[in-house]
Design a protein with these regions (language model features):
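Serine-esterase "nucleophile elbow" of acetyl-processing enzymes
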Residues: 1-43, 58-66, 70
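Short, charged N-terminal helix-start/capping segments
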Residues: 2-6, 41-46, 130-140
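Gly/Ser/Thr-rich beta-alpha loop segments that engage phosphate groups in nucleotides
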Residues: 9, 47, 77
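Generic, ordered loop/turn and secondary-structure boundary motif
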Residues: 11, 33, 52, 194-196
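Structural motif
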Residues: 47-55
Length: 222
């Protein structure tokens, strides 16, 4: 049994040249039982539309085998209305694309789990967390309910955590730091979206307990 990851840069495999940036599935290893493989097909900057149009989903589908489990998480780039190659409407093409992936995987005997987008590290002047993903998390929630597919509400989980901890403490999770900390980024980084290694570990600590509650996914984990 393998775990297949379909998504954007928050899930993408990162190498030494972008350290400390990581996609959160890179930190799943310690939680998994022996023999469980992780195949990460996620790609930076992709929406459901561009992921399908570029054939990236098809690459993963070809590798999928009966009994595998797919984690699907898009939304950060679907909202980019200025880019017709990526933009989708929340309750239209976004839901249609997600359902299309789920249906195609199901035909190969693969069960899917949807995950809403991770909250961005952006705050209002009063210190409250900004809403930065529009209707996409809710659109995914409604789709999951409609077609009876399990959902991990990562948007809600991360928003709750970030809202209950100090901004300075939360900063350590994101690629948001000053100069001279990492050789790859001598001038620092002002990134409110992507995860550092510690952030990837944090996301796994939120995701894994939720996945264990899903009967068909629980056997993946120690």
């Amino acid at each position: 049994m393998n775990l297949l990851c379909f998504g954007d840069s928050l899930m993408q495999l990162n190498g030494p040249d972008t350290y400390p940036q990581e996609g959160w599935p890179q930190e799943l290893g310690p939680y998994l039982r022996d023999g469980v493989g992780v195949y990460d097909f996620a790609k930076n900057g992709r929406s459901t539309k561009s992921f399908l149009d570029e054939g990236l989903f098809e690459e993963g589908l070809e590798r999928a085998k009966k009994g595998d489990i797919a984690l699907i998480s898009f939304g950060h780039n679907d909202e980019k209305s200025e880019d017709p190659t990526r933009y989708t409407t929340p309750y239209g093409t976004y839901q249609e694309n997600l359902k299309g992936m789920i249906d195609a995987l199901a035909k190969k005997g693969v069960k899917s789990i949807l995950l809403t987008s991770i909250a961005r590290f952006r705050y209002n002047e009063d210190g409250t967390l900004k809403l930065t993903h529009g209707e996409y998390p809710e659109a995914m929630r409604q789709l999951a309910k409609k077609i009876d597919v399990p959902l991990v509400d990562l948007n809600k989980l991360t928003r709750e955590y970030l809202s209950n901890h100090p901004e300075k403490e939360n900063q350590r999770f994101y690629m948001n730091f000053g100069p001279h900390l990492y050789p790859n980024y001598p001038e620092g980084k002002d990134d409110h979206t992507h995860m550092r290694k510690e952030g990837a570990k944090w996301i796994c600590s939120l995701v894994v307990p939720e996945l264990k509650k899903i009967r068909f996914a629980s056997e993946l984990f120690c």
